[in-house]
Regions:
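A conserved beta-strand-loop-helix scaffold within acyl/acetyltransferase catalytic domains
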Residues: 4-71, 114-141, 145-222
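Acyl-donor binding region in acyl/amide transferases
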Residues: 70-137
Length: 222
């Protein structure tokens, strides 16, 4: 009989090791990147980065940020954990670790938004892990995956009629998309976001929040 491999968890200390594992999972995104939590640390927040090993092989990871709110201190894990969800032993160990880390920082609850498609199967799994549906979404209410390997024509063919109409309107108005890294660019972005928030009646992110996020990714040349 083959000897069972030892499962253990530890704090991550290497950006290179962390990002290599996160990038190896196609479902992952910037919400579990090293730099996203450098941004939170720059805000003065406590961050958690945990790696899970079977012997010397990394098999799972999650990053979270400790937030304070009127309803109490909590930890938010957006876009994670990154794990093989069919590995029940690993998933159980990971959520036990999440609970332990939350208690370490005096959190009264943990908010999790994994990279799973919304389905009866995924909801059943969350319930089995002791999770409850949150009254408010974390990061975004709806998320999708856009296959950039497809041609522009194929992408547009799969888009909604309303989306295609907006693209045609943007082209008619000579709207261009550019990538900027200057301080002036983020200031202008913050100004426009506040105008949009006022028009659409939602609460905008603060300029400090957006600027620190911008600076974290600019520093890493992302």
């Amino acid at each position: 009989m083959a000897e069972a491999k030892t499962l253990r968890a530890e704090d991550a200390s290497s950006r290179e090791v962390w990002d290599r594992f996160i990038k190896s999972h196609e479902e992952s995104n910037f919400l579990q990147s090293w730099d996203f939590y450098e941004f939170h640390a720059a805000r003065g927040k406590k961050v958690v980065r945990r790696l899970f090993f079977r012997d010397k092989t990394i098999v799972g990871a999650y990053a979270g940020v400790v937030e304070t709110a009127k309803r109490g201190t909590y930890m938010a894990i957006a876009g994670g954990p990154i794990v093989d969800w069919t590995d029940k032993k690993l998933v159980k160990a990971m959520f036990e670790d999440i609970r332990t880390e939350g208690l370490k920082y005096d959190c009264v609850f943990v908010r999790v938004r994994p990279q799973l498609e919304l389905s009866d199967k995924s909801l059943k799994l969350m319930a089995e892990l002791g999770l409850k549906k949150a009254p408010m979404y974390l990061s975004v209410e709806f998320a999708g995956v856009l296959d950039l390997k497809k041609s522009e024509e194929e992408i547009l063919a799969g888009a909604s009629q309303g989306f295609r109409r907006k693209l045609r309107k943007a082209a008619k108005n000579d709207i261009e998309i550019t990538a900027e890294t200057s301080d002036a660019a983020i200031k202008e972005f913050c100004r426009l976001e506040k105008l949009h928030a006022k028009r659409q009646e939602y609460v905008a992110f603060s300029s400090d929040f957006l600027t620190k996020q911008f600076e974290a990714f600019r520093k890493a040349k992302r």
